């Protein structure tokens, strides 16, 4: 079998993609996403107190943001947080673990920062009698997005517009950030 010759990658191939952004951009978003996810992490930890995977994912992405951990190990931590989400039964705990997994996955692809919407969903699921729980969490997230975080989020292309609660939250957050 003949091997294809190695070729130089083009400038376009070396540039960060629209959903990926630069490593510096991903570091900025990672800290914000981890802060958002951490607000609901206790919902997971209450259901699965010995499972540290979502917390380790947040610790890992913060280490990435400080330049102390490379992308590969953080991706593995993100995958582990998502595995933890699949293994816990409580819907609020699932959403909280997914928020942690997406925060960690931001190290690899900036668009995962939009996964903070899972934290808002977790807050809503944990407070079914509070009709404002989701909106209040989204407001907190946006209020705690620094001007640099907002500018970085604006670099992302508009999210897809499929139906469902998660997509609606992501699209609402994107519109609110894009608007100012």
Q: Where are the language model's segments positioned?
A:
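Structured binding/interaction patches within domain cores
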Residues: 2-142
């Amino acid at each position: 079998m003949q091997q294809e010759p190695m070729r130089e990658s083009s400038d376009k191939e070396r540039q960060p993609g629209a959903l990926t952004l630069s490593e510096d951009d991903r570091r900025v978003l990672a800290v914000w996403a981890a802060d958002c996810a951490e607000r609901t992490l206790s919902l997971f930890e209450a259901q699965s107190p010995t499972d540290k995977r979502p917390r380790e994912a947040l610790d890992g992405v913060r280490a990435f943001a400080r330049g102390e951990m490379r992308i590969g190990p953080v991706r593995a931590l993100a995958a582990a947080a998502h595995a933890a989400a699949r293994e816990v039964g409580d819907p609020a705990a699932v959403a909280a673990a997914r928020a942690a997994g997406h925060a960690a996955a931001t190290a690899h692809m900036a668009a995962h920062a939009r996964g903070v919407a899972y934290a808002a969903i977790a807050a809503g699921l944990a407070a079914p009698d509070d009709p404002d729980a989701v909106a209040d969490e989204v407001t907190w997230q946006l209020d705690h997005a620094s001007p640099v975080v907002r500018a970085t989020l604006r670099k992302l292309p508009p999210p897809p517009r499929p139906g469902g609660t998660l997509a609606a939250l992501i699209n609402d957050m994107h519109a609110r950030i894009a608007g100012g």
